[in-house]
Amino acid sequence: KNNGYNTTAIHNYERDFWERDVKYPLLGFDEFISMESFKNPKKYDHWIADEEIFNKTMEVLDKKSGNNLVFTVTVQNHAPFSYKSQKDSVNVKGFSKQDTQSMKNYASGLYISDKALYNFMETIRKREKPTLVVFYGDHQPSYEHEYYKTMNYFKDENNRYKTDYFIWFNKPNTLNPTIENTSLIALGNKVKEIIGLTDDFDRFILEEYGFPNQNKYFDI
């Protein structure tokens, strides 16, 4: 924001959930767009579809001149996954009877979100304005299902707290970020380093600790 960016937060859920309406302004966001601003949105079961929030993000990017930081939080593929199957459902196998329906719903939601994300990225790719996309998950799905006990990946407790991310720029051969294992708390500094907006405090943290990639904390 101090570098002249318009700052917008978007979340397709209730405005006061986790007091986002209070906390986002305190974090420096000029505007917060919540589910109340979506008119007759397309839904995936009881959640507003990711397609809708991607469209809202593009609307903000196209509407506001100058540089923009848009922090978009989706909710389509959040638990619970016990609802009835959708028309675009994906078949799954190898799970217990208890988990099959939930995994089917979860996989179907990912499939639909993946198509929406592709369309969003294609729109960004065609923009004249240089645009950086940072995509990450804030946590794994709920852990009440049996498959977490049987899948080898989750036998390592640390893997229950890891999520994927990517950083992508719509102007090829301009920025070439190095993707590495890192901590979510360091991802913001990573992005600022890529676009050349690190300040003295950021540089101190980077020089002192680098990009932490282990489960650890630092005392102040």
Predicted regions and their residues:
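Solvent-exposed soluble domains appended to multi-pass membrane proteins
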Residues: 1-220
